[in-house]
Design a protein with these regions (language model features):
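N-terminal helix-loop segment corresponding to the beta1-alpha1 unit
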Residues: 10-208
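Short Pro/Gly-enriched beta-strand edge/turn motifs at strand-loop
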Residues: 62-64, 235-241
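Conserved Rossmann-fold dehydrogenase catalytic segment
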Residues: 148, 176-186, 207-223, 242-249, ...
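Glycine-rich beta-alpha junction loops
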Residues: 60, 146-147, 219-224, 261-263, ...
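Aromatic-enriched alpha-helical interface/lid elements that frame and gate functional surfaces
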Residues: 252-324
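Oxidoreductase and adenylate-handling cofactor-binding alpha/beta cores
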Residues: 192-212, 225-237, 278-285
Length: 325
């Protein structure tokens, strides 16, 4: 269809009257042009805070609607997950009629979110400079893969690509094994979380200034931020982190251990927890052993201590161990 098949004026009246001031973001209206995860997760988080999120799809639909992605009763489980609690519209932004409908929505909305590649907003005539002429209080948030500048800016960004180029995959997985991706689409989710954070900051700024602003963020920047102290290790002392499996670089014991019928995850950062663990293991000599007295001692003697613990945990079932903790 060229545009919506129903009366846009009636729609606007319904939307304008559908506010319930019971949540932190009640009364905030968000137009979401995003797709898949990175462009939709932020809207989901804001809808949980009470914002009215109107998901706007092209006539061909969100790519996340592919039924092969986490299928559920003939639908996409991914789409259902990230678009719950949202209203839905179909608008052909490439048509004059569709663009006018979108402009009318912008006039009565607070935020517009997208995850288009750089340059698409300008082609569709929905860039920030165009939208602010319609509503100077509008906030526009764009989630890109690599930002709007630099040699990678025009490249498509998939979660695994961002995980790899950010360095995350280099520190994920088992030692001496190929790089592994995190089990959830953390780059996509990170982009969504950071977009919601940026939108909240922009809404707060608008309360003080009375005007909107543009929020730009990239999935790549989000992942660099989430690297946190791992990135600091490299930037400060050129110490390159390596994959540790479930182990921790600076805490021992901190990993999964095999029991007779499953796995136990042990995390004994403080020495008092270490002493408690030794008591549960009925191995008091471990706590008094000078090689394992402090966490630093245990880190330095990891290769000696871990096999001792592995020999202990494999003797009993998970349920038996949990009874003693």
């Amino acid at each position: 269809p060229e545009a919506l098949k129903f009366n846009a004026t009636l729609l606007l009246v319904v939307l304008a009257s559908d506010n319930q001031n019971t949540h932190a973001l009640s009364g905030v209206r968000i137009l979401e042009l995003g797709q898949i995860i990175a462009g939709t997760y932020g809207g989901q988080l804001l809808s949980d805070l009470g914002a009215e999120v109107i998901k706007i799809e092209s006539p061909t639909g969100d790519l996340g609607r592919l039924t092969s992605i986490a299928p559920y009763r003939g639908q996409s489980g991914l789409f259902l997950t990230f678009n719950r609690n949202k209203k839905s519209m179909v608008i052909n932004l490439k048509s004059d009629k569709g663009l006018k409908i979108f402009y009318d929505l912008v006039k009565i909305s607070d935020v517009v979110v997208d995850n288009f590649r750089p340059g698409v907003l300008e082609k569709l005539k929905i860039d920030y400079q165009s939208l602010r002429q319609l509503n100077n209080k509008i906030i526009q948030c764009s989630v890109t893969g690599f930002g709007n500048t630099g040699e990678y800016k025009d490249l498509p960004a998939l979660d695994i690509i961002i995980q790899s180029i950010s360095g995350l995959m280099a520190i994920t997985g088992e030692p001496n094994r190929p790089p592994a991706r995190v089990g959830i689409p953390i780059s996509d989710l990170g982009g969504g979380v950071f977009s919601s954070n940026g939108i909240l900051a922009a809404l707060y700024q608008r309360e003080r200034t009375g005007v909107g602003t543009r929020v730009e963020l990239s999935m790549f920047d989000a992942m660099l931020s989430l690297l946190s102290y791992m990135g600091t290790m490299w930037l400060t002392n050129r110490e390159l982190p390596e994959p540790q499996g479930s182990k921790h670089e600076y805490t021992v014991p901190w990993q999964a251990f095999s029991a007779k019928d499953g796995y136990l995850v042990i995390a004994a950062r403080q020495d008092v927890f270490w002493e408690k663990l030794c008591s549960v293991l009925n191995h008091p000599k471990l706590s008094s052993d000078g090689r394992f007295k402090t966490n630093q001692d245990r880190v330095e003697n990891r290769d000696i201590l871990v096999p001792i613990l592995e020999d202990q945990f494999i003797k009993r079932t998970v349920e038996d161990w949990l009874k003693d903790f």
